[in-house]
Amino acid sequence: MTTSATEKALEDRAKSLHKKEKKASAKAAAAAGASASTSLEGSPSPASPAKKDKKDKKDKKDKKRSADDADADDDEKAAKKRRKEEKKAKKAAAKSGAATSLESTPAASPAPAASSSASAASFTPTNPAAARAFVESHNITIEAPEESNERPPLPMVDFRELDGKVDAAVKKTLDSQGFSTPTPIQACCWPVLLQNKDVVGIAETGSGKTFAFGLPALQHLVTKHKVLDSGKKKAKGAQVNVLVIAPTRELAIQTEENMAKLGKSMGIGMICLYGGVSKQEQVRLLNQSPPVRIVVGTPGRVLDMARDGSLDLSGVTYLVLDEADRMLDKGFEPDIRAIIGMCKSREEGRHTSMFSATWPPAVRGLAESFMNGPVRVTVGSDELSANRRVEQTVEVLADGYAKERRLNDFLRSVNAQRSKDKILIFALYKKEAQRIEQTLRRGGFKVSGIHGDLGQNERIASLERFKSAETPLLVATDVAARGLDIPNVEHVVNYTFPLTIEDYVHRIGRTGRGGKTGKSLTFFTEMDKAHAGELIRVLKDADQKVPDALTKFPTTIKKKTHSSYGDHFKELVPGKAKKITFDDD
């Protein structure tokens, strides 16, 4: 019995009872006299004990029948759910490449030609032994969702394994990039995403995440949205199909540039949306030809343009949240939830990818809210730890005045005035960054800066000069500590220690990327003593030398849990003052 039928039956019984109660009330009123009255709901005055007992039995019988009907309805729903799960398990076991219905695989596309589109079948590597060795050598963990009985797919360790699984144009574009082998995060995410499944990728910035979700995004467009490429608009704003959200303008620009290397040769329009520049110009670019299918942007600007009607997110079926932990740290969770609510739902076939450097409870909660049984891929550890390929040097200085002299000594020791080696220098505040930049420039060094006081165009220009080694020194605040993938940074200098140990780990992670080694130099003073214990732990975990002077500071670590930062979070907000009162003598 369906829910609507059950409700109708209950309503009919209620009407019948109401009529009988009115008749009984009339008889009771006649017997008791004019003083008898009924309640507002039409309940009768007390009748004879025999009639009352008979009525109570009937009421109990009707209630029991209604409960039985409801239980039967619940049993029917449970049986239907079991049949659906059994059907899904059989299809997975059969490993059929045929297209399935929307109920079983929401984003399955009409079966395309075998030569030009991805197969929906489970991926099997040509050399399983090599794939397992790849997983072990790179310390990779691949976990299938708990509710699934399927084994997680092994990685694609060779680009040739993409043949026949992606469109020929997508494969040709990838081949033109000149890569020799996939990175660990790419090798593990491609088999999952090309099967139209959700994925959570835990890996450090600079590990190749953009191509990990970028290549499947292009394949998704070629198969699922090929019919939409006529460019005819059905909504007020520009309708897009792939949306990538990043926490900062710099990371969004960088991600769009990397995706453009793959997509623009295929004629797929894409745009980067971020604040600090003209919104009118971005609206104009959104409506250009070829029509924009991919948007990469920051949460604030994307939500702003979606709300004012410039951007239509109702057609988004491929969603990527990049640096998810960083976005939650910056307080973007409400914006992210609002944006996801404007996209297609999971039931309508939206696929979601989430990438993060760590896996704190807040990120897990976001994944549980919006993802559909994701496969979790972890490269390395999901705990915050320093890159072992970075040689960490910590110098304990008497005071802050010694930093400037020591920085000059270091730069001259590595011949920074003539060398093209890239050195990234971190300051804590923008005023401090400006002062360091000016001092170095007066000393004859080629240096650029990136901090909050610079306009967007100035920041982009500084980054480009640093990337090209035109100015091999870059002084930055923590705005550049996460997300930016600047290749071939040889040295990182922490002129001032950051506010948290997490920021320290992310700062030194700017070097030693892509399998290369790097070096970091950190100046530590009495002002930073609260971080001594945490810094010693990070150094020991990475098998680095701990200077004797550092161990002289208090090393107690208050282990607290924070929704975004995880353990070892130092609460900087002072507690509420306590009022002390004394008893009168």
Swiss-Prot record:
A motif (DEAD box) lies at residues 322-325. Its main location: nucleus. The keyword Transcription does not apply. Residues 190-377 form the Helicase ATP-binding domain. One of its GO terms (biological process) is rRNA processing. Residues 406-554 form the Helicase C-terminal domain. It is found in: Nucleus, Nucleolus. Residues 1-124 are annotated as: Disordered. GO terms for molecular function: ATP binding; ATP hydrolysis activity; mRNA binding; RNA helicase activity. Residues 26-43, 94-124 have a biased composition (Low complexity). InterPro entries: DEAD/DEAH_box_helicase_dom, Helicase_ATP-bd, Helicase_C-like, P-loop_NTPase, RNA-helicase_DEAD-box_CS. GO terms for cellular component: nucleolus; preribosome, large subunit precursor. ATP binds at A203, E204, T205, G206, S207, G208, K209, T210. Keywords: ATP-binding, Helicase, Hydrolase, Nucleotide-binding, Nucleus, Ribosome biogenesis, RNA-binding, rRNA processing. It catalyses: ATP + H2O = ADP + phosphate + H(+). ATP-dependent RNA helicase required for 60S ribosomal subunit synthesis. Involved in efficient pre-rRNA processing, predominantly at site A3, which is necessary for the normal formation of 25S and 5.8S rRNAs. PANTHER family: ATP-DEPENDENT RNA HELICASE DBP3. The Q motif is unique to and characteristic of the DEAD box family of RNA helicases and controls ATP binding and hydrolysis. Belongs to the DEAD box helicase family. DDX5/DBP2 subfamily. This is ATP-dependent RNA helicase DBP3. It comes from Mycosarcoma maydis. The gene is DBP3.
